[in-house]
C-alpha cells in the first residue's frame, strides 16, 4: 500500500463533490484555495502525495471551489491567495467538511458515500479493489461517513467477507504503528449481501441495507461492476431502479471489455444509457491511472524542452510496448474470446497514444482533455492488415523447464487462431503527425514484463560527428523512454564524448528512476481511479465517443483477420516474439527500442 496523504478540504461542486448533492447548492460560498501558489510543474511523485495531488486537481478544474469564509465574504476562483487571506479563510479538515457545509445551509443532514463492489468474490475485487479502498481509507481520503458492501452470488457472511478481504490488505511500505488498528477500523465498514445480478428483489434488499448504514444522511452511491460484461446491463438495470440514491449522486464504474467491436460496444452503451446518464458511467482503463501515464501530459506541457519537439519535424517514430512474461494459464477460455488486440491494443495502448499525440487542450478540465483525445482517434488512418503482425506462443523449454503452448490450455479450443501477440504500425493524418509511424507491440509469454513508451527522434542533419559514431546511425538516435512498469522511470538517451584522448562518442542516459529519487511508494492505479470516481473527476475515464472512435479504428482490422482466418506466426514461450515484428518495423525504417542494451 502506498504512502499518501489527503487534502485538508476538498473542492465542492454539483458535478464532482462526493459529499454534496443539489440539495446544498444554494448555500455554497465560492473561495480560492489558499495554496494556489503550487505550480503545475508539481508533477510526479510529489504528486504521489495526494494532498498536493488534490490541490492541483482543484486548481485545474474550471469549476469553483467552496469553503466557509469567516465574515461571509465571497472569494472567487480568480481571487489571489492574498485576497483569500483578507476575507479570512477558514480551513476545514476533510473529515469535518461535509458537516460544516451542511450546517452552513441551516440543516443538520450529513452526507455519506456507499460503495458497492458487485462481483466481490472475484479476483479483481480481492486483489485490486478492496486493497485500493483500504489504501484510500488509510490515508484519510475517504469521507468520514462511508460504507463498503460486497455483492455477489456466493453465499457469505459479513465476517467471512472481512476474512477474505483482510488477506489482501497490507501496509507493506509505510510500516506505521497503527496499521493493524486501521485495518480493523476499515473491515468494520465492510459488509456483504448475497444476490443474483439480475434480481430486482435482491437489489431492493441491498438498498434496505444501504439505507440502514446511511442512517438518514444524504446518500451518494458508487457501484463498481467487477463482473463479466454479459451481465453488465442486468446489474445496472437492477441497481438503477432498485438501489440508486434518491437524494444524492449514483455512479457506476464499468470494467473492460466494452464490447468486441463497434456494433457490440454501441449496443452496450445504448443499453447502459437506458438506465444511466453518460456522466454516471465511469468506463475504467486502469492504465490511465498509472503514475507515468498521468505524468505524460505534465512532462510535455510543463517542460519547454519537450513541447517544441513534439511533432513530425523532430520525432521519427513513437513506440508503445507492452509485454508479459507469462501466458494465459488459467484464463485461456476468457482470453480466447478477445485476443491480444482487443485485450491490450484497442484500449490500453490506444488510450496512451491519444494522450501522447493530442493537441494542447483548452484546460485540464476532463471534457477539454477528452475532446482532444477524440480528435486524435478520428484523425487516425485505417489500419491495413499488411501493417500488422500477429503471433501465438508455442511450447518451449527454458532451463530444463518446459512451458506450455497457448493451445495446451484445456480451456482453449484446439486449433485456435487467437493471437497472443500483435504488432502494428498506425498513422495519424494531421499536420502535427503526418508520416510519423506509431508502432504498437503487445504480447504474452515473452521474455520480460514491461510497459513503456519510446520516442525516437530524428537524426541530426549534417552531424559533424558521424565519423566518430560508427556506421549505424540508429545507435546515436536520441530517445526518450517513459517506463510505465516495472521500476517506473523516465530517461533520455544522449550522445556524449568518452573521457580521454581522442574523440569517441558514447550514448548515455539522463535517468530519473522513481525509486531512487522518491521515497514514497507510487499509488496503485486503482487507488487514483477510485478516488477520482468518488470525487466525480472524469479525466481518466473513457467517454462514449472515445470508445466509438477506438472501435471504429480496430473493428475493420479485426473483422478482416477473422474472416480471412489469418494464421498467427508462432514464437517460443519466453522469447522476444515473432520474427515478423522485426520485419514490420524495418518496413517503416524503425528498430524496436526495447531490443537495445539499456533494457
Curated annotation (Swiss-Prot):
D-glucose 6-phosphate binds at residues 256, 286-290, 324, 343, 444, 449, 485. InterPro entries: G6P_DH, G6P_DH_AS, G6P_DH_C, G6P_DH_NAD-bd, NAD(P)-bd_dom_sf. Residues 1-23 are annotated as: Disordered. It catalyses: D-glucose 6-phosphate + NADP(+) = 6-phospho-D-glucono-1,5-lactone + NADPH + H(+). Residues 1-18 have a biased composition (Low complexity). The modification N-acetylvaline is found at residue 67. Expressed in roots, flowers and siliques. Residues 1-66 form a transit peptide. Its main location: plastid. The active site is at residue 348. Its EC number is 1.1.1.49. One of its GO terms (molecular function) is NADP binding. Keywords: Acetylation, Carbohydrate metabolism, Chloroplast, Disulfide bond, Glucose metabolism, NADP, Oxidoreductase, Plastid, Transit peptide. It is found in: Plastid, Chloroplast stroma. Disulfide bonds join 171-179. Optimum pH is 8.0-8.5. NADP(+) 1 binds at residues 119-126, 153, 256. Pathway: Carbohydrate degradation; pentose phosphate pathway; D-ribulose 5-phosphate from D-glucose 6-phosphate (oxidative stage): step 1/3. NADP(+) 2 binds at residues 441, 454, 483, 491-493, 576. GO terms for cellular component: chloroplast; chloroplast stroma. Catalyzes the rate-limiting step of the oxidative pentose-phosphate pathway, which represents a route for the dissimilation of carbohydrates besides glycolysis. The main function of this enzyme is to provide reducing power (NADPH) and pentose phosphates for fatty acid and nucleic acid synthesis which are involved in membrane synthesis and cell division. Belongs to the glucose-6-phosphate dehydrogenase family. Forms homodimer. Interacts with G6PD1. There are 6 glucose-6-phosphate 1-dehydrogenase genes in A.thaliana. This is Glucose-6-phosphate 1-dehydrogenase 3, chloroplastic. It comes from Arabidopsis thaliana. The lineage of its organism: Eukaryota, Viridiplantae, Streptophyta, Embryophyta, Tracheophyta.
Amino acid at each position: 500500500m502506498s504512502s499518501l496523504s489527503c487534502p485538508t478540504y476538498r473542492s465542492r461542486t454539483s458535478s464532482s463533490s462526493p459529499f454534496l448533492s443539489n440539495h446544498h447548492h444554494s448555500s455554497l460560498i465560492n473561495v480560492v484555495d489558499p495554496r494556489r501558489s503550487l505550480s503545475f510543474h508539481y508533477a510526479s511523485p510529489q504528486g504521489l502525495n495526494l494532498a498536493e495531488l488534490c490541490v492541483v486537481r482543484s486548481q485545474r478544474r474550471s469549476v469553483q471551489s467552496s469553503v466557509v469564509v469567516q465574515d461571509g465574504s465571497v472569494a472567487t476562483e480568480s481571487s489571489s491567495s492574498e485576497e483569500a487571506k483578507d476575507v479570512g479563510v477558514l480551513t476545514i479538515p476533510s473529515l469535518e467538511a461535509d458537516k460544516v457545509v451542511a450546517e452552513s445551509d441551516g440543516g443538520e443532514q450529513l452526507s455519506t458515500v456507499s460503495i458497492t463492489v458487485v462481483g466481490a468474490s472475484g479476483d479483481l475485487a480481492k486483489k485490486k479493489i478492496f486493497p485500493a479502498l483500504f489504501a484510500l481509507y488509510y490515508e484519510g481520503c475517504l469521507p468520514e461517513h462511508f460504507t463498503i458492501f460486497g455483492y455477489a452470488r456466493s453465499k457469505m457472511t459479513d465476517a467471512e467477507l472481512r476474512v477474505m478481504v483482510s488477506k489482501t490488505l497490507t501496509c507493506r511500505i509505510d510500516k506505521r504503528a497503527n496499521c493493524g488498528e486501521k485495518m480493523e477500523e476499515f473491515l468494520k465498514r465492510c459488509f456483504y449481501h448475497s444476490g443474483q445480478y439480475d434480481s430486482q428483489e435482491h437489489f431492493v434488499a441491498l438498498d434496505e441495507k444501504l439505507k440502514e448504514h446511511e442512517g438518514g444522511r444524504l446518500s451518494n452511491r458508487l457501484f463498481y461492476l467487477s463482473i463479466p460484461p454479459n451481465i453488465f446491463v442486468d446489474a445496472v438495470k437492477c441497481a438503477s431502479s432498485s438501489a440508486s440514491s434518491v437524494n444524492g449522486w449514483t455512479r457506476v464504474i464499468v470494467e473492460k471489455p466494452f464490447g468486441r467491436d463497434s456494433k457490440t460496444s454501441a449496443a452496450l452503451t445504448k443499453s447502459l444509457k437506458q438506465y444511466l446518464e453518460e456522466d454516471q458511467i465511469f468506463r475504467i482503463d486502469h492504465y490511465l491511472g498509472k503514475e507515468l501515464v498521468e505524468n505524460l501530459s505534465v512532462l510535455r506541457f510543463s517542460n519547454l524542452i519537450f513541447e517544441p519537439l513534439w511533432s513530425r519535424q523532430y520525432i521519427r517514430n513513437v513506440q508503445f510496448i507492452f509485454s508479459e512474461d507469462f501466458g494465459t494459464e488459467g484464463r485461456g477460455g476468457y482470453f480466447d474470446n478477445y485476443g491480444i488486440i482487443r485485450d491490450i491494443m484497442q484500449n490500453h495502448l490506444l488510450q496512451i497514444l491519444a494522450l501522447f499525440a493530442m493537441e494542447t487542450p483548452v484546460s485540464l478540465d476532463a471534457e477539454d482533455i477528452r475532446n482532444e483525445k477524440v480528435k486524435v482517434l478520428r484523425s487516425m488512418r485505417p489500419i491495413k492488415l499488411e501493417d500488422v503482425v500477429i503471433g501465438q506462443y508455442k511450447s518451449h523449454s527454458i532451463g530444463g523447464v518446459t512451458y506450455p503452448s497457448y493451445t495446451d490450455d484445456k480451456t482453449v479450443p484446439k486449433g485456435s487462431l487467437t493471437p497472443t501477440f500483435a504488432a502494428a504500425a498506425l498513422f495519424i493524418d494531421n499536420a502535427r503527425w503526418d508520416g510519423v509511424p506509431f508502432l504498437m507491440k503487445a504480447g504474452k509469454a515473452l521474455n520480460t514484463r514491461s510497459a513503456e513508451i519510446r520516442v525516437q527522434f530524428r537524426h541530426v542533419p549534417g552531424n559533424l560527428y558521424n565519423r566518430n559514431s560508427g556506421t549505424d546511425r540508429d545507435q546515436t538516435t536520441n530517445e526518450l523512454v517513459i517506463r510505465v512498469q516495472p521500476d517506473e522511470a523516465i530517461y533520455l538517451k544522449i550522445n556524449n564524448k568518452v573521457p580521454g584522448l581522442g574523440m569517441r562518442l558514447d550514448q548515455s542516459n539522463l535517468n530519473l528512476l522513481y525509486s531512487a529519487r522518491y521515497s514514497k511508494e507510487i499509488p496503485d492505479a486503482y487507488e487514483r481511479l477510485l478516488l477520482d470516481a468518488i470525487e466525480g473527476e472524469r479525466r481518466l475515464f473513457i467517454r462514449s465517443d472515445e470508445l466509438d472512435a477506438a472501435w471504429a479504428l480496430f473493428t475493420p482490422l479485426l473483422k478482416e483477420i477473422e474472416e480471412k482466418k489469418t494464421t498467427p506466426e508462432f514464437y517460443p514461450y519466453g522469447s522476444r516474439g515473432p520474427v515478423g515484428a522485426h520485419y514490420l518495423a524495418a518496413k517503416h525504417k524503425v528498430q524496436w527500442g526495447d531490443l537495445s542494451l539499456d533494457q
